[in-house]
Amino acid sequence: NSEDLDFISSVSKETLSFDLLDVIQSGPDDRLNQTSFTQPALLATSYLYYKKFLSITELTPNIMAGHSLGEYSALVASGSIDFKTALNLVYKRGLFMEKSDAGSMFAILNLNIETIYSICDEVRDTLDEIVAPANINSANQVVIAGSHKAAALASEKCKVAGANATGILKFG
């Protein structure tokens, strides 16, 4: 609803010194794709979905859980931290990611973890650059991360081995 959108807009202006809602709606895309903007945008979207859920159901969740960035959404939904605090934290999280060494992340789908580790080891030894599984999201989805070159090569080798691989993020 418009009250929730106004809330996102005003809190982001106050906390981050820019209107997050405007960035989400108007871009430009290259700005929205920077992790310092992407992370707050995802938090805001999750928050809005949660508020919508509460408005259309009579359910009151007893337990909240989140994974990675979703942990912040869960903390807000549970009342453990307020939206303003979470927004500031995820913005800083995105800034730190942008300042880290340059690299890429790829989601590797439908390939067993042993094969992924083996491919990452092989690429690391061949190129003498870092690439490794960074996040095991499920039995069917593992995120690998490393230098642009090593992560891209490992992703391609995973595809040859039968995986579906999707580039998800460049950082640094």
Which positions does each model-derived feature cover?
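An amphipathic alpha-helix/helix-turn recognition signal
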Residues: 7, 41, 68-69, 81, ...
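Gly/Ala-rich beta-loop-alpha elbow adjacent to hydrolase catalytic centers
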Residues: 46, 62-70, 74, 82
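Alpha/beta catalytic cores of group-transfer enzymes, especially the acyltransferase/condensing modules
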Residues: 13-18, 27, 51, 78-172
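Helix-rich "cap/lid" substructures immediately adjacent to catalytic or cofactor-binding pockets
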Residues: 1-65, 111, 144
